[in-house]
């Protein structure tokens, strides 16, 4: 009886220590949703009574598929493919360590900012992202957007550090 209990305890300890880390924790296919807010500040120029000099803009929720594949297991690097439902596809690289992933800076060209019902523009933003994996199935990426936009012939600087992408393993 004591021997059986000892074997059972050893098996439980061995199984509980099998937590994935690094590339193995992140590799796979995910479904994601992203949301957040950016701040736009007009660059000094002529006056405009129609468009404010600064404003916050809540980004529309975006969904898509996220794929993480091994690039170099010795260097802990991965290839990350984000396939947005709007047709935008982003490919970047990242580095995994323990339960954390850091993506190389990438650019988004399809980001749209709308103001009022008649003013809309596409923006170019550079994105930095870091994230963690939870329960071996959910990645939470915190993103920082930095870029420019031209709205009604006025140039704006875009900054956002409250953008999050939550990805769940398929």
Language model segments and positions:
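Sec-dependent signal peptide hydrophobic core
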Residues: 5-10
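Flexible, solvent-exposed loop segments that connect beta-strands
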Residues: 39-54, 109-118, 150-156
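A short hydrophobic beta-strand element
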Residues: 30-32, 78, 103, 133-147
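Predominantly extracellular/secreted and cell-surface proteins with exposed
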Residues: 57-129
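Tryptophan-anchored aromatic micro-motifs
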Residues: 24-48
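Positively charged n-region of N-terminal signal peptides that target proteins for export
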Residues: 1-4, 19
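Edge beta-strand at a domain terminus
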Residues: 136-170
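C-terminal motif of bacterial Sec signal peptides marking the signal peptidase cleavage site
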Residues: 14-17
């Amino acid at each position: 009886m004591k021997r059986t209990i000892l074997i059972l305890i050893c098996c439980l300890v061995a199984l509980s220590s099998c937590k994935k880390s690094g590339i193995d924790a992140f590799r796979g296919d995910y479904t994601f949703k992203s949301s957040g807010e950016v701040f736009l500040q007009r660059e000094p120029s002529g006056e405009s009574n129609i468009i404010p000099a600064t404003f916050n803009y809540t980004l529309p929720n975006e969904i898509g598929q996220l794929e993480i594949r091994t690039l170099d297991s010795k260097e802990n690097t991965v290839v990350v493919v984000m396939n947005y439902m709007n047709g935008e596809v982003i490919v970047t690289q990242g580095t995994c360590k323990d339960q954390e992933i850091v993506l190389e800076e990438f650019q988004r060209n399809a980001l749209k900012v709308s103001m009022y019902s008649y003013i809309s523009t596409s923006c170019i933003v550079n994105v930095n992202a870091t994230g963690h994996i939870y329960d071996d199935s959910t990645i939470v990426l915190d993103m920082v957007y930095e870029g420019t936009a031209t709205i009604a012939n006025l140039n704006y600087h875009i900054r956002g550090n409250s953008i999050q992408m939550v990805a769940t393993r398929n």
